[in-house]
Amino acid sequence: MIITQTSHCYMTSLGILFLINILPGTTGQGESRRQEPGDFVKQDIGGLSPKHAPDIPDDSTDNITIFTRILDRLLDGYDNRLRPGLGDAVTEVKTDIYVTSFGPVSDTDMEYTIDVFFRQTWHDERLKFDGPMKILPLNNLLASKIWTPDTFFHNGKKSVAHNMTTPNKLLRLVDNGTLLYTMRLTIHAECPMHLEDFPMDVHACPLKFGSYAYTTAEVVYSWTLGKNKSVEVAQDGSRLNQYDLLGHVVGTEIIRSSTGEYVVMTTHFHLKRKIGYFVIQTYLPCIMTVILSQVSFWLNRESVPARTVFGVTTVLTMTTLSISARNSLPKVAYATAMDWFIAVCYAFVFSALIEFATVNYFTKRSWAWEGKKVPEALEMKKKTPAAPAKKTSTTFNIVGTTYPINLAKDTEFSTISKGAAPSASSTPTIIASPKATYVQDSPTETKTYNSVSKVDKISRIIFPVLFAIFNLVYWATYVNRESAIKGMIRKQ
């Protein structure tokens, strides 16, 4: 009996201890129990743990679950190797482009760089769904699990899809099966250039894209918003230093090859070169060199060293300018507008040098009565031939009258400046003798040396006038051509 009571008390104690341990807030001594790692208690942010929180319906969790099931169902049995509507209809891919930056343009490589958001839209009946949302934003990873157009750029040398920090791709699925696929691309594309009008040239740089494998019987392309609004360039998107972006023209082409016909979407960006750099670098130096070469016409023709330096220096300068002007251009086989200008300037400079050589070699020296005095020996003209007198007398007799002769010691003649009055010694002196009579004539005028050539006088007028006419025709021609091209682009 005692053993039975003892066992009963022992079992009662164990039950009490068990109840105390399972109570959440107390210990055996009535103090609060410390938190164990596995318990869920009230968090610092004020939220309740799932264990103690009331049952609140989570719509986002339900939507995620719903769309997960929708995607799993859509991709179940989906074959991304087959295009939409295979065997029934042609797949239409609508495209549009937003240009974030345009440039730079390389003249030597004949290419340009463009950064775009490239958007494609198409319809896939296999991806229709019913759900709480009409448009389902998707991760770019899903793009590898569905069919996407095999679009490529016909004139692209290199295209880069941006992947920082993740692939810059956007994919949206509408409940009717329409997909929007957007990528950010940097494209290096060819730009054929015709440089006959350089540097007043205008270029149309194309951007062409289309399907690589699907012909027009399978896939066709069209512009999403029409030809006028499907290509947009950001207002601050120009990265051009030497060009102005005049506008763009959108179109569609059909190309034919041995494998069939393909649709090609085209956009031509019209560029006008800025001429300011070339005016400062080439045109003004050429004009100044030509003017400098014509200064030699105003120098005396006896100034051989000075005029030679003018001619040779200007010719060498034009040669240097013509070489440097070609460095920024591709090595084309035809002459550009700048080449023609430099060639004409070179001809003017070289002609000035040839003109001096002609004047110096062929033109005879002319004499005039003005300018610098050059002494000449006076000529003795024998009026009456007779035998010379044997004895010099200090007197001579004219009609029975005797006159003394005043003989000067210095027989040289001094230079007489213009306008000086003749002296008494300049009058004719008659030397008389019984047998001979001589008359010595002194010049009443003195001759001067004149270095001005008639060819120089003509060149001073002809060369500047011809050069001015050439510039007038040259600039008027290219300015009018530029205006006509701009008007044509606006009409398009």
Swiss-Prot record:
It catalyses: chloride(in) = chloride(out). The keyword Transit peptide does not apply. Glycans are attached at residues 63, 163, 176, 228. Residues 29-274, 326-336, 479-492 are extracellular. 4-aminobutanoate binds at residues 119, 182. InterPro entries: GABAA/Glycine_rcpt, GABAAa_rcpt, GABBAa3_rcpt, Gabra-1-6_TM, Neur_chan_lig-bd, Neur_chan_lig-bd_sf, Neur_channel, Neuro-gated_channel_TM_sf. It is a multi-pass membrane protein. One of its GO terms (molecular function) is transmitter-gated monoatomic ion channel activity involved in regulation of postsynaptic membrane potential. It is found in: Postsynaptic cell membrane; Cell membrane. It is linked to Epilepsy, X-linked 2, with or without impaired intellectual development and dysmorphic features: A neurologic disorder characterized by variable combinations of epileptic seizure, and a varying degree of intellectual disability and developmental delay. Some patients have dysmorphic facial features or mild skeletal anomalies. In general, males are more severely affected than females, although there is evidence for incomplete penetrance in both sexes. GABAARs subunits share a common topological structure: a peptide sequence made up of a long extracellular N-terminal, four transmembrane domains, intracellular or cytoplasmic domain located between the third and the fourth transmembrane domains. This is Gamma-aminobutyric acid receptor subunit alpha-3. It comes from Homo sapiens. The gene is GABRA3.
